[in-house]
């Protein structure tokens, strides 16, 4: 089952009521996304072998919060949503939507915010990005969107992605439409931008017990039923792995049919779990899944494959 985004004026009253029952999409609410992520990363850094890198990621998340408010985005996406709906495409499709210079402005603002906090190799990386031409930055962005990770060094990718993600999240939060679930394929990709998830989460509150995949780019969440592979939609050979016990808040859901896995986080086990932070902090579980022969079906925005990986 795929999810299409229907323009507000094309939704009948019955569709509006149905959409309110089980929301197929949760558009990003940017008010506290980045601060909460930064706080969780810092918390998880304590007594974690990856503590230094988690604190580094927290600096980037905090910078995103600052830049978000320094550079708000105003854009009318009504026409874009209608066009994408007619074409059956995500409205902010990363492979189609032209990028304007706003994302590069965000990148340079992130660099300015981060430079006082960086030293050594990390400082050299952002200084190198600061000197890059607009064309070079666009080429790196296009390579990341095409999953051509060999063309962008893994130390530059998190900074480029942080700016792109902030830009796409700003756009996604402005979408003036509702979502309707329709039968189809490709539920493994974000219905808003076409990127992949970072992890999935079984939620509490108004969406109690429902699983949502969290986009690694635009921060949108979309509903996928539980006990079904989020990558191939099969359900006959699923297994759940953890490094702790059955009550663990972070598990990996593996599929024997397609040979992939995705992290699944449980808010009922730990209300503070965060899609990006807890995924990054549990890389030991990723190593275990690789040993078991499973490939990751997602990418964390702070950890990109390097050349040859």
From Swiss-Prot:
Keywords: Cytoplasm. InterPro entries: FdhE-like_sf, FdhE_C, FdhE_central, FdhE_N, Formate_DH_accessory. The keyword Cytoplasm applies. Pfam families: FdhE_C, FdhE_central, FdhE_N. The keyword DNA repair does not apply. It is found in: Cytoplasm. One of its GO terms (molecular function) is ferric iron binding. GO terms for biological process: protein maturation. Its main location: cytoplasm. It comes from the Bacteria. One of its GO terms (cellular component) is cytosol. Necessary for formate dehydrogenase activity. HAMAP family: FdeH. Belongs to the FdhE family. This is Protein FdhE.
């Amino acid at each position: 089952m795929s999810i299409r985004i229907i323009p507000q004026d094309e939704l009948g009253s019955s569709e509006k009521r149905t959409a309110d029952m089980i929301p197929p999409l949760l558009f990003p609410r940017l008010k506290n996304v980045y601060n909460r992520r930064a706080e969780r990363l810092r918390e998880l850094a304590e007594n974690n072998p990856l503590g230094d890198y988690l604190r580094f990621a927290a600096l980037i998340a905090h910078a995103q919060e600052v830049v978000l408010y320094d550079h708000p985005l105003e854009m009318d996406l009504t026409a874009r949503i209608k066009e994408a709906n007619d074409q059956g495409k995500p409205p902010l499709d990363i492979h189609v939507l032209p990028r304007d210079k706003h994302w590069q402005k965000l990148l340079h603002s992130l660099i300015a915010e981060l430079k006082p906090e960086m030293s050594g190799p990390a400082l050299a990386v952002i200084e190198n990005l600061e000197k890059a031409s607009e064309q070079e930055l666009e080429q790196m962005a296009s390579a990341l969107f095409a999953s051509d990770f060999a063309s962008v060094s893994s130390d530059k990718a998190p900074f480029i992605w942080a700016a792109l993600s902030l830009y796409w999240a700003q756009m996604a939060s402005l979408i003036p439409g509702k979502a309707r679930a329709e039968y189809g394929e490709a539920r493994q990709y974000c219905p808003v931008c076409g990127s992949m998830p970072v992890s999935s989460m079984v939620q509490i509150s108004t969406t109690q017990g429902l699983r949502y995949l969290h986009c690694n780019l635009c921060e949108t969440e979309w509903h996928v039923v539980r006990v079904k592979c989020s990558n191939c939609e099969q359900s006959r050979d699923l297994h759940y792995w953890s490094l702790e016990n059955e009550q663990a808040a972070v598990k990996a859901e593996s599929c024997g049919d397609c040979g992939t896995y995705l992290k699944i986080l449980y808010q009922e086990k730990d209300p503070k779990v965060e899609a990006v932070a807890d995924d990054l902090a549990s890389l030991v579980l990723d190593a275990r899944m690789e040993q078991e022969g499973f490939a990751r079906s997602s990418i964390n925005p702070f950890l990109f494959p390097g050349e040859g990986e």
